[in-house]
């Protein structure tokens, strides 16, 4: 059976970097945004819409035809979102069965539970997360003030939790659902990856 590491994370905690570095240390395949591309291809939906759904954001990218009832529109969105989750599940299972791998987010810990993945959850205090987001200086974040950044971080986490809780029936971030919970506050992600890699 392949070795599988899944990583859930608070936004800005360094979970994505940890996953990438762990994969490098161990020689595992690394899957993150590639899953979004694969889902979009499988469902014939745009990558932008798929990402919005996976982040638990409101469904606003598909236009509603004038005259449609809200009931019909809601049913349409629900069906689209369920199709995305099913495609996500199929793709993640296919990837996990190919080789040893690290998978970031996407409810992978739940989807692969029968394959006994090593489930990690990464978190940090809000100040560290704000600092990390500012430091990486992405196009979407570089113009935000610290106050705006904090609001964005908390909003993203709320949406992730809502999506995860809805589809898994578990509580996002609950220590009972993970094998290892890591507080990255004050630590260098590269050093954490080096320590964790020794488990494998």
Show which residues each predicted segment covers:
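ATP-dependent small-molecule kinase phosphotransfer cores
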Residues: 40-100
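Pre-Walker A (Motif I) flank of P-loop NTPase domains
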Residues: 1-10, 99
């Amino acid at each position: 059976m392949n070795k599988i590491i899944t990583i859930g994370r608070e936004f800005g905690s360094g979970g994505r970097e940890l996953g990438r570095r762990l994969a490098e240390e161990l020689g595992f395949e690394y899957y993150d945004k590639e899953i979004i591309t694969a889902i979009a291809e499988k469902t014939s939906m745009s990558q932008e819409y798929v990402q919005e759904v996976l982040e638990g954001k409101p469904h606003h990218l598909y236009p509603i035809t004038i005259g449609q009832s809200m009931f019909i529109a809601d049913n349409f969105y629900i069906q689209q979102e369920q199709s995305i989750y099913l495609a996500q599940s199929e793709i993640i299972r296919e990837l996990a069965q190919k080789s040893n791998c690290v998978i970031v987010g996407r409810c992978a810990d739940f989807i692969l539970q029968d394959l006994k993945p090593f489930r990690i959850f990464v978190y940090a205090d809000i100040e560290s997360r704000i600092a990390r987001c500012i430091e990486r200086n992405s196009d979407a974040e570089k113009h935000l003030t610290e106050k705006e950044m904090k609001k964005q971080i908390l909003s993203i986490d709320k949406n992730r939790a809502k999506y995860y809780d809805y589809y898994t029936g578990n509580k996002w971030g609950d220590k009972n659902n993970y094998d290892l919970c890591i507080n990255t506050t004050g630590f260098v992600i590269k050093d954490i990856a080096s320590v964790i890699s020794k488990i494998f």
